[in-house]
Amino acid sequence: MKGIVLALLLALAGSERTHIEPVFSESKISVYNYEAVILNGFPESGLSRAGIKINCKVEISAYAQRSYFLKIQSPEIKEYNGVWPKDPFTRSSKLTQALAEQLTKPARFEYSNGRVGDIFVADDVSDTVANIYRGILNLLQVTIKKSQDVYDLQESSVGGICHTRYVIQEDKRGDQIRIIKSTDFNNCQDKVSKTIGLELAEFCHSCKQLNRVIQGAATYTYKLKGRDQGTVIMEVTARQVLQVTPFAERHGAATMESRQVLAWVGSKSGQLTPPQIQLKNRGNLHYQFASELHQMPIHLMKTKSPEAQAVEVLQHLVQDTQQHIREDAPAKFLQLVQLLRASNFENLQALWKQFAQRTQYRRCLLDALPMAGTVDCLKFIKQLIHNEELTTQEAAVLITFAMRSARPGQRNFQISADLVQDSKVQKYSTVHKAAILAYGTMVRRYCDQLSSCPEHALEPLHELAAEAANKGHYEDIALALKALGNAGQPESIKRIQKFLPGFSSSADQLPVRIQTDAVMALRNIAKEDPRKVQEILLQIFMDRDVRTEVRMMACLALFETRPGLATVTAIANVAARESKTNLQLASFTFSQMKALSKSSVPHLEPLAAACSVALKILNPSLDNLGYRYSKVMRVDTFKYNLMAGAAAKVFIMNSANTMFPVFILAKFREYTSLVENDDIEIGIRGEGIEEFLRKQNIQFANFPMRKKISQIVKSLLGFKGLPSQVPLISGYIKLFGQEIAFTELNKEVIQNTIQALNQPAERHTMIRNVLNKLLNGVVGQYARRWMTWEYRHIIPTTVGLPAELSLYQSAIVHAAVNSDVKVKPTPSGDFSAAQLLESQIQLNGEVKPSVLVHTVATMGINSPLFQAGIEFHGKVHAHLPAKFTAFLDMKDRNFKIETPPFQQENHLVEIRAQTFAFTRNIADLDSARKTLVVPRNNEQNILKKHFETTGRTSAEGASMMEDSSEMGPKKYSAEPGHHQYAPNINSYDACTKFSKAGVHLCIQCKTHNAASRRNTIFYQAVGEHDFKLTMKPAHTEGAIEKLQLEITAGPKAASKIMGLVEVEGTEGEPMDETAVTKRLKMILGIDESRKDTNETALYRSKQKKKNKIHNRRLDAEVVEARKQQSSLSSSSSSSSSSSSSSSSSSSSSSSSSPSSSSSSSYSKRSKRREHNPHHQRESSSSSSQEQNKKRNLQENRKHGQKGMSSSSSSSSSSSSSSSSSSSSSSSSSSSSEENRPHKNRQHDNKQAKMQSNQHQQKKNKFSESSSSSSSSSSSEMWNKKKHHRNFYDLNFRRTARTKGTEHRGSRLSSSSESSSSSSESAYRHKAKFLGDKEPPVLVVTFKAVRNDNTKQGYQMVVYQEYHSSKQQIQAYVMDISKTRWAACFDAVVVNPHEAQASLKWGQNCQDYKINMKAETGNFGNQPALRVTANWPKIPSKWKSTGKVVGEYVPGAMYMMGFQGEYKRNSQRQVKLVFALSSPRTCDVVIRIPRLTVYYRALRLPVPIPVGHHAKENVLQTPTWNIFAEAPKLIMDSIQGECKVAQDQITTFNGVDLASALPENCYNVLAQDCSPEMKFMVLMRNSKESPNHKDINVKLGEYDIDMYYSADAFKMKINNLEVSEEHLPYKSFNYPTVEIKKKGNGVSLSASEYGIDSLDYDGLTFKFRPTIWMKGKTCGICGHNDDESEKELQMPDGSVAKDQMRFIHSWILPAESCSEGCNLKHTLVKLEKAIATDGAKAKCYSVQPVLRCAKGCSPVKTVEVSTGFHCLPSDVSLDLPEGQIRLEKSEDFSEKVEAHTACSCETSPCAA
């Protein structure tokens, strides 16, 4: 019963809404008032906005069933451009009049159940007006469900079919229904929008979860009331908000707000008169895009005569770039592009005919044509190319940009396809290449609009690839693959697989570069079908038969597909397996995973997490490999407040067989919250570069030894040599992921180019033309213009007008050049380009280069009739004019340039950014307005304002409301109250005067932004910003005629020292070096006789002054301590006595009671006072201190380490009674400070404490007096505390010095006072004037030539000593006027672990000084580098600046992630410690006078590889020998060295082989395995002396034997004995072979053959190949390819199972019986019984084993592992004589005996 009642109630409730759908009267005209407002700007008041307002009456009457007429009456349009809400709307009469004719025409629409159907409008009504109708009818769209009050649905509207929520409220008393409807435009099933310019961009879907650039929503409120005829819509109010922000949303956003009101006025009798014309169906409510797609939002132009307008703009552009670029030139160029878009084919032909022969106009027109992108423009470009009216370069550039800018429609696509097939395009390879690549891009853009790419679109590219493959044209194959990569369509995968190894048998025969191009072609396809591409790439990556470079490229492409965790783990598993056989691939994979795992970009978070997990599978020691192995380096950043980031990546692919990288790829990628793009990518491939760099054309195949070596290798087991390499250099460039150009240069092209440059220019047309243009001078102007960016996103507003977000950027580069060249001697008829390097060249030139970049971003309404919105303009203008005369003499290594002085002010760089509110309408273009968004008002600075009472402020607010009364405060006021804000204004001006050059360099900065409204980055960017870098002439005493800069290097550098010669007379003439040295010493004030005396006196005076200050501070400290003790009488007597006893016993216990590090903590300072036993010492005289120093220094010099101990004890005793020691120690070097005994460091702590302020002293005395501890308890506390020492308090231990440096190290690590003095003294002795023994290497002179002949300027003289063990450089900068000012720089590498530098300046370089030291060592247990800088004296301005900057250092360090503690560190000193905690992280400690900060595990952008040892798979400690050994280490790592000593062999890759060689048989130690076979080195044990080795070297025409006989060295060359008396020996023929005596043996070098050095002394052997032989050797010494894990490669390329098996594989059979080698390789049968599948079997070795010859028995044997293949026992196997390999699979491995020495019954020769 209850159910029946409930059902009846529900039925009754539903019946109440049976007729609530809105209807219109069938007999009357319904009249409504309609008002629509669109405002663009910022939500805060007081800022400018721009918008439009439409007022009208709307009449609706019935036409037929479910069909109504709509007519607009009395339309009125108003514009708003001003400060909101103060300024009023202004009536736009002309625009109203222009639109009234169309707006007042009736329209018909279908309407049923509250839903709007199709709309019918007259054909002559524009789409803009039709969309305004849609905006009105959109208010009538309402869907009412009878049984629900709250419901969601996807509803049709102007913006598409989007998610909508309804809430219905009924007012039964008033018979009204209120409906609230909200629409989310971010959640649409079918959204109406249009995006232009991002066809090639990658949209970031995951970023929308973090931030949305555009967000939009609308809300509607309906008031419905029941009438006799039904429910009537009484009022509809709508409000739409579009929020736009390029940054994070929390930083604010610009808004576009649409408000609509449709209010019922009443009804009137009658019906609307049906129109006489037929109405056209314009579709449903959805917005229809019209001509606004071709209308730029930054211009509004009438284009009735585009040809004439284009001519006018062209003339304007050309005239504006005659001398310099005018500010409006980029905007004019965009106007030209807009006019070309409006031009038809005939207009374009007329323009070309008019300007084709006028160079500057022609260039400008050709710059704009491809940017237009219309069908007519592309068609016209095709005609120009077909008619051959363009040069090859013009045609290639035009095609490249035209196809990328053309709208991807059907007609444009068809024209592009026809253009590619045009015979004139195919005629020129450059044009054809550009056309094919651009066509691939067009296919990509065209097919992105379709569900699948049609076959006919890809057919030209597929046919090109197939035809090129059939003909074997590798360059065309590469071109087709690159174009298919640009297209990026999955339909091309099968075509590309034909060129991928593992998918096609023919692909394995293709060059590696073709295979890698095929892999790279899959990268863009992966964006469409990542799963399929991942499958293909993973197969290639896992295939061991594929070349390593191709596998690395597959790995690169795989990670670009952003695989999941499963795929990443599979990749890591493969890399882990390959780490034993292919270190290049393993290193590349590991470094790529490591780099990705550290990425901070949110787009890559899932991939970074997957890589982090997968790295656990790999061996971390792979990160320890050096840069000889393939690497991936990545640096990225992402700022969430900007919602933008960037990543720079470099992929370095090395090869085991080459010295140089075979491929380098660098790319820069940008990330935004909307898209991500590869802005630029550059790839360079090099193959066989070593062959080309050798610069020789030696026919090694013609040498007799080449044939001999070829015969020998045939006897090796299945020998496989290296494939030949054809020298080739290729490169490509990509923009936004699309390849736009590539080139290939083979050896022939490069050699022909070099030959052409060295031959007479008359033989080569191109060289002759270039030289003629250069020598005859260049006069002209060059200008290029680009529209570098066009991005547009258009969405409809609820009003029916298009809202657009756009970004445009245009750039103009201009250069006016006027040059004249003179060459001495005058070029003759046989003059070549290379002779310019031996001539004297004078260049007189005047250039005026300038660049102007204009960026415009807009947000607002953009229609063909009117525009309104916000516009951001950013301009960067650089203008660098120069007039000069340059002299170049390469023979004398002299360069000089002269330029006149600056006569007028010149703005070098100008940057301006402005934000406007703009309105324009087509009916009245002159009324266009631009208003600054942040008004320029005269508001006072907030600091100068006065407090005012409330009454006045309220009055002002009332007046503001009255001014905006027209807006209707109830309907449209944005805020309840309006406040006035002063704009945020900042300015900065600074000028620097360069008096010597007579110029001022000024910087002017000014910003006027909206940060006072909301202090975020977005509001800081809104407003006006100006930056100017200006150069102005400065007043000087005498007029400057010209400025000169001269650089001279080499032997004639000394003759240019102006202080030594009279410029007018003897400049440039050679001078005696002694005179040069003496004169320069006098100029610099270097007088050896007075130097030590002056410095000693200066030191003593400073020391006395320090002692006086120190004594006064110590007395004050003692008095203060007594006061504190008397004030704290409550302390226990035991505490007092124990404190005093601690003080009295401090001298005896100082060595066991070191002070702890200082701390800002109160309690830590108290404990530190307890542990410092030296704080109450009394001082002694400074004279005693000085005597101790001198005595200690003398002892150190005489006795070395012995003197060290004596000086330490002496100085310790001295320091216990002298306060000056602590003063001295504060200025000691950083290296001694942390390594000296604890008691000396305690002196430093006391010194730092006594220099603290008075308030700090009181705190410390309180802590001291209130503590009680004995010296023993102090030591005990220290022992407990030292186990918890802070990281930054660890000691830096310098690297142990070699024997030669121990003496200096002992001095530096002695006591503090001795260390200070001896260090300074040592540095004075080391800083010898290099001019005493070396001429200057470089002289740089800058001078101003004045009309009064007064010298003015500077000169720098550089000396360098790099031949000695201590490399040193000295530079002196002198004022060439009569002043004594100079600056002196001295840098020296003291030892392999330490370098020092000093900079002194002032009068004779004696006023100011800065010292620096860099040294390596250990910080804790980590290898570290410490840099110390101290400044004994610096200018006062520097001090004041340092104090100001120092206040911000703690905060800045905190913001950068550093942690720290306030500590009293050494004054006037900064220390930086970089400790390597892993190859990719380091710990940083920075100590400045008042602060210690540190950063743990700071990530390095690239790994710092430490030593990798072949025998240990662990991280090796780096030597950090960076100062002297780095070049040698690099060369050693590249070159490699093979060593043989007794039975120990060390290969090129550093693998030790502890195996004896078989007796009496030659083994191939090393040979050239390239097809050239230039050399072979053989070795065997000596017959006569088993401890010695015999060496045989075959190369060129020489067969060289080296051996020991009767304990004497013997050598034969081509069987002719050469005694030691005839050494050194050098061949007369080329290539050269040289043999010279070295120690007890000889050294052979033949660099042209690939032998850098071969050293032999009978017992040991060392062989070092040349660099270019990297990876080209084989033999027992290995391949020299750094692949240590597969070092045991046998001649057939397989890897041996053990070392002995490996050595035996390289043994050579005897060529004759006299050699005594009785071993040979033989297949053996396994003796023991083997059963397979339960049946007996006999097994044979797959590979031969070394056995004695027939008739000989083994004397020595070893066990070797070999593989066996088994056969059934009843199967016979015939092994022919001499067969050395069984072509069967290996069933198992077993150890068998191999013979290494044999005994024969009869001599083989006798047989």
Curated annotation (Swiss-Prot):
The keyword Signal applies. Disulfide bonds join 1538-1677, 1561-1713. Residues 1-15 form the signal peptide. PROSITE patterns: VITELLOGENIN, VWFD. One of its GO terms (molecular function) is nutrient reservoir activity. Residues 24-664 form the Vitellogenin domain. Induction: By steroids (estrogen). Residues 1126-1163, 1205-1232, 1263-1276, 1309-1320 have a biased composition (Low complexity). Produced by the liver, secreted into the blood and then sequestered by receptor mediated endocytosis into growing oocytes, where it is generally cleaved, giving rise to the respective yolk components. SUPFAM superfamilies: Lipovitellin-phosvitin complex, beta-sheet shell regions, Lipovitellin-phosvitin complex, superhelical domain. GO terms for biological process: cellular response to estrogen stimulus; response to estradiol. Residues 953-974, 1095-1320 are annotated as: Disordered. Glycans are attached at residue 1094. Residues 1112-1123, 1187-1198, 1233-1247 have a biased composition (Basic and acidic residues). Residues 1101-1111 have a biased composition (Basic residues). InterPro entries: Lipid_transp_b-sht_shell, Lipovitellin_superhlx_dom, Vitellinogen_b-sht_N, Vitellinogen_b-sht_shell, Vitellinogen_b-sht_shell_sf, Vitellinogen_open_b-sht, Vitellinogen_open_b-sht_sub1, Vitellogenin/Apolipophorin. The serine-rich portion of vitellogenin encodes phosvitin (or two phosvettes). It is assumed to be phosphorylated to a level of about 80%. This is Vitellogenin-A2.
